[in-house]
């Protein structure tokens, strides 16, 4: 599976055996004391940490327990990860004030449109950070983003991601059990996201 993914993405590989993960990119997967998760814990929302596009992929037997993330969508609907049971879930942490987030949005929308049109068992959910509801809604409408997003709740939702959202943007691909199967720290391209989602879909139930 790993060799198949590497060939598709055509980027350098760093094996992190202790973590049971495959990190693809120019730097190792790591946490940062100034990360948005750390800011969420401290209540400090002064800035953000921008990632370099590092990709981490976890084999099925190396994945942790399902996420318990929950929140309220920008439309006011309660939502939780368990609602996406038996579907591959893509979570994207974003803010309209974040340049890399804005740049990657069309790529996320492209993949979402293609997968939903094909009837694939996939759900996308944005996780907004630091925007008011009206500001976030206006941004999504202006950019024709059709998948939903959770409201910012002062960073509490980010804490449910267990330190996996260390940069803005961060994209997580969860398997059908709600476990993190892949992470992109920084902007993600349509080709990369499509490849990651396809690999998780190919695992079956």
Residue ranges and their predicted role:
Residues 1-68, 204-205:
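N-terminal targeting signals for export/organelle localization
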Residues 59-89:
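A short beta-strand-turn-helix
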Residues 102-143, 156-160:
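Structural microenvironment flanking redox-active thiols in thiol-disulfide oxidoreductases
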């Amino acid at each position: 599976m790993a060799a198949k993914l590497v060939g598709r993405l055509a980027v350098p590989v760093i094996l992190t055996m202790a973590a049971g993960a495959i990190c693809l990119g120019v730097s190792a997967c790591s946490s940062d004391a100034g990360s948005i998760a750390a800011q969420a814990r401290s209540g400090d929302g002064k800035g953000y940490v921008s990632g370099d596009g590092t990709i981490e992929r976890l084999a099925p037997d190396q994945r942790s327990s399902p996420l318990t993330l929950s929140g309220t969508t920008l439309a006011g609907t309660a939502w939780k990860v368990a609602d996406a049971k038996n579907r591959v879930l893509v979570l994207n942490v974003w803010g309209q004030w974040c340049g890399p987030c804005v740049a990657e949005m069309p790529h996320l929308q492209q993949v979402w449109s293609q997968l939903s049109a094909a009837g694939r068992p996939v759900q996308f959910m944005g996780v907004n950070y630091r925007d008011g509801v009206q500001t976030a809604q206006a941004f999504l409408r202006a950019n024709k983003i059709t998948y939903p997003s959770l409201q910012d709740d002062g960073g509490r939702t980010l804490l449910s991601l267990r330190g996996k959202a260390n940069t803005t943007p961060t994209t997580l691909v969860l398997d059908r059990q709600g476990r993190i199967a892949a992470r992109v720290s920084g902007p993600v391209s349509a080709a990369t996201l499509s490849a990651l989602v396809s690999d998780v879909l190919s695992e079956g139930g």
